[in-house]
């Protein structure tokens, strides 16, 4: 799997909860994306053999920096799963067909 660690710098008026809410709003209709509770440490074991992506927003010691963690199974969410998902889109099948 792939575990991404993304460091971001935020303005004083942008909180951890605000970032989480933006992500949750953006992905609210995506059945394969799960936004976890703040400061949840994630593992590729949580997404193995799935087309899912788990995302968590974590605090750091520095108040103007946050870490966004994401985990995917690069075989299912990667090449093979991407091919199936694209086929579903092209032919009008339900998005999760062959993936869940």
Where would I find each of the regions flagged by the language model?
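NAD(P)-dependent Rossmann-like dehydrogenase/reductase catalytic/cofactor-binding core
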Residues: 54, 59-100
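C-terminal substrate-binding/catalytic lobe of Rossmann-fold NAD(P)-dependent oxidoreductases
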Residues: 1-68
């Amino acid at each position: 799997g792939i575990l991404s660690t993304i460091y971001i710098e935020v303005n004083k008026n942008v909180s951890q909860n605000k970032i989480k809410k933006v992500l949750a709003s953006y992905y609210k209709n995506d059945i394969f994306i799960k936004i976890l509770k703040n400061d949840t440490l994630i593992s590729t074991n949580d997404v193995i053999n799935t087309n899912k992506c788990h995302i968590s927003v974590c605090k750091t010691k520095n108040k103007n920096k946050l870490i966004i963690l994401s985990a995917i199974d690069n075989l299912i969410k990667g090449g093979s799963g991407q091919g199936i998902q694209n086929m579903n889109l092209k032919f009008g099948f339900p998005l999760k067909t062959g993936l869940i």
